[in-house]
Amino acid sequence: MLQYQIDRIEHQIAEDRAQTGVFLIGPLERGQATTLGNALRRVLMGGLEGSAVTAIRIAGVNHEYATVPGVREDVLDILLNCKELSVNSRSAELEIGRLVVAGPAEVKASDLQFSSQVQVIDGNRTIATVADGHSLELEVHVERGIGYRPVDRHNEDTSAIDLLQIDAVFMPVKRVNFNIDETAVAEGGSARERLRIEISTDGSITPDDALAQTANQLLELFQPLATVTLVEEVGVEPEPSAEAQIPLEELNLSVRAYNCLKRAQVNSVSDLMGFSYEDLLEIKNFGSKSADEVIEALERIGISIPQSRTSA
């Protein structure tokens, strides 16, 4: 297997603190770049844990179609602005941020007061605009999760009628693009590939960390396949063969042999397969001639029994 290397050839941080990193991975065998790129992209876009605003509460508001006196934006606009906030919570529990701003003022994300567990990535993002003589009291809920979580209206907490739920987007990676460079050539002229992958995040995670977390997830996914062992089903006995299910009557034994076997509770070939030649001789009134007759009848259908118990 080829030993490849990973180089970060570009890293940018935008004004809103979003980050973009470009990585070059290679050399790879033909076809491996596509395999690697698709796997990385799928996990990067939907498999990493992130933080998001999941609900807000505005003083004096109990539904999303309301307006707030003295605030330029309506409640739907405020909901959308809060949904787009980039946050990073290090807590597994619900975190709540609060603000009370008196106008005239432009309410920014940096006005939210969270515990030390939550970082607001872009503090300059505008939430609302408050006019002179008015104020805005806002509560923002932040949680951690994976992927996309729509509001479940059926299970919504109806006891908190003023808590406005938000469809949560927990994905810290916003965009992944990759392409394949096939210009690398190995000794002997065989083609090699390099994967160029561009990762853009919301700033709550660096592209380097996103790539590392993705690689670890894929390792955990594939590692068990390297030590696959077949587990036999416990308590499941194999079904008897068709020959074993043949009734004793169809062996065409003599009357003497047949009657002796019946008295010994032998009703089918399956029962006979538990006997050795010595066991047959121990059946009452069952001599060697009858035993030989049974052996021959079994051999005609392709079944043999051991000579003695020790050879069974």
UniProtKB/Swiss-Prot annotation:
One of its GO terms (biological process) is DNA-templated transcription. It comes from the Bacteria. It catalyses: RNA(n) + a ribonucleoside 5'-triphosphate = RNA(n+1) + diphosphate. The lineage of its organism: Bacteria, Bacillati, Cyanobacteriota, Cyanophyceae, Synechococcales. Belongs to the RNA polymerase alpha chain family. The N-terminal domain is essential for RNAP assembly and basal transcription, whereas the C-terminal domain is involved in interaction with transcriptional regulators and with upstream promoter elements. This is DNA-directed RNA polymerase subunit alpha. Disulfide bonds: none annotated.
